[in-house]
Amino acid sequence: MSNTEAAGDTTSPYNSERLQDYAEDFRRAAHQAVDWIADYLEHARRYPVLPKTKPGDLIDALPKSAPEQGEPFSALLRDFEQQILPAVTHWNHPRFMAYFACTGSAPAIVAEMLAAALNTNGIHWQTSPAVSELEQVTLGWLRQWLGLPPEFFGIIYDTASVSSMHAIAAAREMADPNARVEGSRSNLVLYTSEQSHSSIEKSAIAIGIGQKNVRKVPVDSAFCMRPDLLRDMAAQDYAAGLRPFCVVATVGTTSTTSVDPVAEVAEVAEKYNLWLHVDAAYAGAAAILPEQNHILAGAERAHSLVTNPHKWLFTPSDLSILYTRRPDILRRAFSLVPEYLRTEEHPRAVNLMDYGVPLGRRFRALKLWFVLRYFGREGIQRLLRAHIAWGQEFASWVDAEPRFERVAPAPFSTVCFRYRGSDEENHALLERVNASGQLFLSHTELNGRYVLRVAIGNLATTHEDVQAAWEIIRGFTTETRRHGEILNL
């Protein structure tokens, strides 16, 4: 067919007959996929937590170019199981205890399927009213559960790193409104604790504050920020002609899950007119429990707070929420509307594109809406209480075992501990445990020492899994010593 003929052909490549075949193919494949997903969620423990692959194995196994002709769903599903699955680290595995769990619960998975089918893009209200308004409703529900003030406006981003970057950019906007046009001043200073997440420094790099202008506030023996030293550092920087503009307090640090004294940090922030951002990406969910709500004491005085439902609210990645009591400043920092996106203003229409860098927006709120409704507050509270109780029990086992020592408080369900030996011996122990495929742990460094981490929070984890994890660790300790890789008792 000539180009002219092709250009004049108004028949869709998917005519009605082909569309019917396409729909039937999809129906069969989707049913197979749902059956596979249900079986996987029920039997994830059949797989090794970590895949037994080497870097480059999957690249070498797959074709070097895409096919010229299309392939049937059956071939795609077959290759998924035979080639992709063996290279997967199973975050849904009950014994995935390396990082804060990102468990894909059934209601959220169903919601993700529906969101993908709708394929809506929530650029502004008109492009998808449901995206804009369900986000407001769902984040309002969660705000109530967390005990945050009603004036806190919520918006969804993908990860806490991005949420915090937007908060810090808003902080810069409050301190230096000219930065949007002229760029950052060189004397802006940001404060955060020695235990804060690396994304805070990355945010300073990304928005032009500079890594050298990030002050790491020392922590106490429980790895919590010291507000007295924060006050001293801010005073010194002001005296030196610098402009402190933001402080980040953490509720549930990544290494130890320590909780900074937010109320005391807020006092310093108010004294020096700093934007207070609270990183509650992990532990914020615990505030749903009445007995844990104190961890957010002082957060009502913050300018912004981030929490991640994809960490401990059984919502698959990615979904991070930024709450702020100054949405006007956040909007001022980012709103930039080209003519083709201008729509009629309405007081109840929220255009989410005005509150961040991304223009395109997935329907992320749908999966959180499904999760909150499916489990309910009481169901989520039961799960959180179980995880925290198991974490406390694991900590007690460590305390009772002479060969091990706990090196940090365990306020939630993450325990930091180490074998009473060298860093090399602890590293060897971790390598053996993870290579077994029975359990996946991670490590950190505290006070210059190599430390093991157990993070309990997976939806499928049982008390028996936690017990098994401890026995696996103890067993490999004995075995590693027997192989001569642990040298000291």
Question: What are the language-model segments listed below?
Answer:
Residues 2-151, 431, 439, 450, ...:
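N-terminal entrance/gating region of PLP-dependent enzymes' catalytic architecture
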Residues 12-22, 118-126, 149-155, 185-188, ...:
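Glycine- and acidic
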Residues 152, 402-405, 438-443:
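A short linear hydrophobic-aromatic micro-motif
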Residues 159-331:
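Conserved PLP-enzyme active-site core in the AAT-like
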Residues 253, 272, 297-399:
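Active-site C-terminal subdomain of aminotransferase-like
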Residues 405-433:
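Conserved PLP-binding catalytic core of the aspartate aminotransferase-like
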Residues 409-414, 436-453:
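Conserved PLP cofactor-binding pocket of PLP-dependent enzymes
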Residues 446-489:
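PLP-dependent enzyme catalytic core of the Aspartate aminotransferase-like
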